[in-house]
């Protein structure tokens, strides 16, 4: 009797080995079904907003805009096929400036690409870098709660990271 119990427990412990693992991300869970808001843009490895501004007045204007509901938002819509997902991106940059385009991501190698067809920065430095980050993003990291888009600004060797969080699902 005791031997049978140990054999059953042993078989149950082996089940995870037979179920296999998938080494790609669930791109649909990461990107779709939620609105994401920019938290900050930083150099890769950093944890605070990069200093894009020439003076405190510009920075304050950008940060006040970032704090508003409905600004710096992105919504990814798409369909998956194997490890690939592609679709439309929409959202807002700053008040009165909508965002639209297409995007794709690969769950196997974490590649990301966006083609932004609508979006203006209104002269705001953070908005300019937000749009540039979306347009130049080459890869992503994250999960269903946090999203990081990595990009290099035009003419720069430094990698930047756009940090997003979920505002609603």
Show which residues each predicted segment covers.
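Bacterial N-terminal signal peptides that target proteins for export
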Residues: 1-9
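Intrinsic disorder/low-complexity polar-acidic segments
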Residues: 12-14
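C-terminal motif of bacterial Sec signal peptides marking the signal peptidase cleavage site
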Residues: 16-20
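Lipid interaction determinants
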Residues: 21-169
């Amino acid at each position: 009797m005791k031997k049978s119990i140990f054999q059953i427990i042993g078989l149950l412990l082996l089940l995870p080995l037979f179920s296999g693992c998938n080494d790609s991300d669930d791109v649909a869970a990461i990107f779709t079904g939620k609105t994401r808001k920019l938290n900050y843009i930083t150099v890769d490895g950093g944890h605070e907003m990069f200093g894009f501004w020439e003076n405190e007045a510009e920075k304050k204007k950008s940060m006040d805009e970032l704090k508003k509901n409905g600004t710096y938002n992105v919504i990814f819509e798409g369909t998956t096929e194997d490890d690939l997902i592609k679709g439309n991106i929409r959202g807002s940059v700053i008040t009165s400036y909508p965002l639209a385009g297409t995007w794709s991501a690969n769950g196997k190698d974490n590649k990301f690409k966006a083609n932004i067809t609508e979006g203006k920065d209104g002269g705001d430095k953070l908005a300019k870098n937000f749009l540039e980050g979306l347009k130049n993003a080459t890869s992503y990291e994250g999960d269903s709660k946090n999203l990081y888009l990595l990009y290099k600004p035009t003419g720069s060797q430094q990698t930047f990271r756009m940090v997003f969080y979920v505002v609603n699902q």
